[in-house]
Swiss-Prot record:
Enzyme Commission number: 4.2.2.10
Glycosylation: residue positions: N123
Source organism: Aspergillus niger (strain ATCC MYA-4892 / CBS 513.88 / FGSC A1513)
Function: Pectinolytic enzymes consist of four classes of enzymes: pectin lyase, polygalacturonase, pectin methylesterase and rhamnogalacturonase. Among pectinolytic enzymes, pectin lyase is the most important in depolymerization of pectin, since it cleaves internal glycosidic bonds of highly methylated pectins.
Signal peptide interval: 1-18
Gene: pelC
GO biological process, one term: pectin catabolic process
Alphabetically ordered keywords of this record: Carbohydrate metabolism, Cell wall biogenesis/degradation, Disulfide bond, Glycoprotein, Lyase, Polysaccharide degradation, Secreted, Signal
Protein name: Probable pectin lyase C
InterPro entries reported in the protein's UniProt record: Pec_lyase, Pectin_lyas_fold, Pectin_lyase_fold/virulence, PEL
Disulfide bonds, paired cysteine numbers: C81-C100, C90-C220, C316-C324
Subcellular location(s) per record: Secreted
Family: Belongs to the polysaccharide lyase 1 family.
Chief location: secreted
Amino acid sequence: MKVPFLQLLCLNAALASANVVKGAAQGFAAGVTGGGDITPSYPKTNEELVSLLESDEPQVVVLTKTFEFIGTEGTTTENGCAPWGTGKSCQLAINSNGWCGKNPVVTITYDNAAKNGIHIKSNKTLVGEGDKGVLSGKGLYFEGGVSNIIVQNIKITNLNPGFVWGGDAFTFFGADLIWIDHCETSLTGRQHYVTGFHPNTRMTWSNNFLNGVTTHSAGCDDHHYWTMELVGPGDQITFQNNYVYHTTGRGPALSGTTLFHAVNSVWSSIPGHAIEGGDKGRGLFEGCFFEDVVEIAPAKPENQLFSASEANAASCKSALGRACQANSYSKSGAFGSSETGFFKDFAGLTIAPAGSATDALAYVPKNCGIGRL
């Protein structure tokens, strides 16, 4: 029996951690409770917000305004570089860890706050009220084994968009049981989502808007390149009902040994490529829609990819316990990868339900991101 797309989104809704959270995580992060039933806190200042998120106690934190971090930690002026020229729409780069190499040297000035995210600790719920919950000039950082965290209905923006290495929206460096839902990321210096060199397990990223429209880019236009760099060993990510828009690369880069289950997500307006990475990255894509994507993935990708079609959908049963939903395409390149050798790695994980790709196209772009719960 075919389950309607909207009904899929309502499954397990009774498991929400507190009344400020809408719905419940599906996929790998199923069961996450965040701060639980703790009485919500409504911070008024940056200092109050940081203190709550970095505390060792469970917290439910509700954002009711824009928290402006730009200028709060000063600026740095130093030598950087111009890998793509100095045109008004070209990104320059911070010389992080000697990244600039032999590229032309230029003097740059960037805001310090965006380079250092808030180090959110375990058992937290962070939720925005309506469309008001915005972090401007500061991202979130999950490290050191933190677990059981919900972030829902917020926007992270203005992270030194003119500079590569200027700031990441969501950084994961050893985390478990994390649900990122209905969030928008935009105007980042580097990645919208990045996983580091420690395992990041049981994560669900759902209903998010990865907005690639930017002021400066590696292509010297308004398409952001640095989208999702996933390099953790053994990352486990359900990528459900997300909208990747107006980017040109790394969407995602499966560069570590990430297990990436993309379900009912939409990629649109991508003049470059979407998927890349190394030979150990693993990605299953089903019920997804690719619209105006010049190159979805290389014809012979290094990584292990499975793109669901009507012809191969039944082969998913060994991994997911059900057949896959076929992907769909409009004005996009081919995506014929059918590697199944990694399907055994789904054992023991909670699998998100899937609807059709055409239903995803109709629903996801209009309902993802902040203010659309």
